[in-house]
Amino acid sequence: MKFAVIVFPGSNCDVDMFHAIKDELGEEVDYVWHDTENLDEYDAILLPGGFSYGDYLRCGAISRFANAMKAVQKAAEQGKPILGVCNGFQILVESGLLPGALIRNENLKFMCRTVQLRVENNETMFTSQYEKDEIINIPIAHGEGNYYCDEATLKQLEENNQIAFRYVENPNGSVSDIAGIVNEKGNVLGMMPHPERAVDELLGGAEGLKVFQSILKQWRETYVVNA
């Protein structure tokens, strides 16, 4: 399986994402600069965290216009797995690939610590290796991670089982404790916590690795078993 890590000016979690795929998952991965127009050779697309374009205007508001995002949109329409973490989640929301918005944390402070998440839906291509309601420890590092949506959108997310992760103890004011959501099709996941920073027991825990293992399992079942 071949992954692409999209790198924007100001990305700073791309190396962590690359390490998670190459060294922990053992799969092929490339850094792909934001001006690329073709992602057809890749099986999965990863949008890392950071401060793309300095977070000017709004987090992710400029990155949404990058050439690569047109290719990401195409990949999403093709059903390829798209994972956006932290700033990557913000870019997915700004691009319209996921509903809602990410606003300033309720306490107006940047927060960097490990939090507990509850797996709300383990039937997605990103969460199949978890148990439903499993509690996992994943780091956060954000100042604008407060997920917001209106009541109608929240109702739709709940009815369609699009909420992938919730905070056990809400750190930022996110509506309904939401930490991560998928699109209606189920192939685009955005989450504020950083699973790529929790892939090695020697570095504090590996409870985020199952996100990437789930993607790999889905791909193998679809393209290898049926080959």
Swiss-Prot record:
It comes from the Bacteria. Disulfide bonds: none annotated. Residues 3-225 form the Glutamine amidotransferase type-1 domain. Gene3D superfamilies: 3.40.50.880. It catalyses: N(2)-formyl-N(1)-(5-phospho-beta-D-ribosyl)glycinamide + L-glutamine + ATP + H2O = 2-formamido-N(1)-(5-O-phospho-beta-D-ribosyl)acetamidine + L-glutamate + ADP + phosphate + H(+); L-glutamine + H2O = L-glutamate + NH4(+). Pathway: Purine metabolism; IMP biosynthesis via de novo pathway; 5-amino-1-(5-phospho-D-ribosyl)imidazole from N(2)-formyl-N(1)-(5-phospho-D-ribosyl)glycinamide: step 1/2. GO terms for molecular function: ATP binding; glutaminase activity; phosphoribosylformylglycinamidine synthase activity. Its EC number is 6.3.5.3, 3.5.1.2. SUPFAM superfamilies: Class I glutamine amidotransferase-like. GO terms for cellular component: cytoplasm. Keywords: ATP-binding, Cytoplasm, Glutamine amidotransferase, Hydrolase, Ligase, Nucleotide-binding, Purine biosynthesis. It is found in: Cytoplasm. The active site is at 86 (nucleophile), 194, 196. The keyword Nucleotide-binding applies. One of its GO terms (biological process) is 'de novo' IMP biosynthetic process. PANTHER family: PHOSPHORIBOSYLFORMYLGLYCINAMIDINE SYNTHASE SUBUNIT PURQ. Part of the phosphoribosylformylglycinamidine synthase complex involved in the purines biosynthetic pathway. Catalyzes the ATP-dependent conversion of formylglycinamide ribonucleotide (FGAR) and glutamine to yield formylglycinamidine ribonucleotide (FGAM) and glutamate. The FGAM synthase complex is composed of three subunits. PurQ produces an ammonia molecule by converting glutamine to glutamate. PurL transfers the ammonia molecule to FGAR to form FGAM in an ATP-dependent manner. Part of the FGAM synthase complex composed of 1 PurL, 1 PurQ and 2 PurS subunits. This is Phosphoribosylformylglycinamidine synthase subunit PurQ. It comes from Bacillus cereus (strain ATCC 14579 / DSM 31 / CCUG 7414 / JCM 2152 / NBRC 15305 / NCIMB 9373 / NCTC 2599 / NRRL B-3711).
